[in-house]
Amino acid sequence: MRNILAIGLFIIACLFVVSCKEEDTSLQGKMGYLRLDVATVSSTNTKSAVPENYNPKQLHVEIKDASGNIVKRTDNFDLEWKGEEMMLPPGNYTISASSNGFDGNASGEGIPYYTGSTTVTIPVDGSSVSASIVCRLANVKVTFRFDASVLNVFRSLAMEVSSSVSGVDSQLASCSVTERVVYFPVGDLTVKTSVTNMAGTPFPALEKPITGVKARDHYILNCKLGDSGNGGITVEADDNIIPYIKTEIKNGQL
């Protein structure tokens, strides 16, 4: 199942009587209330370097009006907005969310990047409306896997994955029973093996291109003995083993 972060946004629109003359009379005494309670979402902060202590579930959320102006924003939804209620004038809004402090343009372990958005209308008649954001994995997952058949056959064995995206570091995994999971930005990938047998003889490097790479793809790189006894790579595209994370919005008061 693909990585999915679901956000529920409950919007209560109600009448608000303006008692102060200084307030904008163009609203004609009507305001709306937006109630949020997210568990893992955030809006785009474009930083290609992975921040220290990056937490993909710390969410940056932005609310923009119909003119594209940011009217509300937070870099930490759980800490600042979860369970809170905010007042908004009637109108159309876009709510965007993404993992805070990172735009997915780097490779490495433990750096999934999530993003999503939705639109909502705050009505003037006081009726209640609801909206939801589904934040999906926006980068690419790669799993290195070494078959047991190769563990005791070669002196050294490694797989390296490089990205076609400029400035993105390659990722390497040496022969081990432990899988290694890394993430890349969306872009074509190249897998290369480096193999030396027990006699110290290196084998010619094997390369496999992976093209047509899309967000949420999961590639499992299996390194195992081929029919000739040499090391080989098989590439399995499988996004079904990626768990989903569901987040819900609850009511609160700002």
Predicted regions mapped to residue ranges:
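Extracytoplasmic cysteine-anchoring/structural motifs
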Residues: 20-73, 78-79, 85-254
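Sec-dependent bacterial lipoprotein signal peptides
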Residues: 1-18
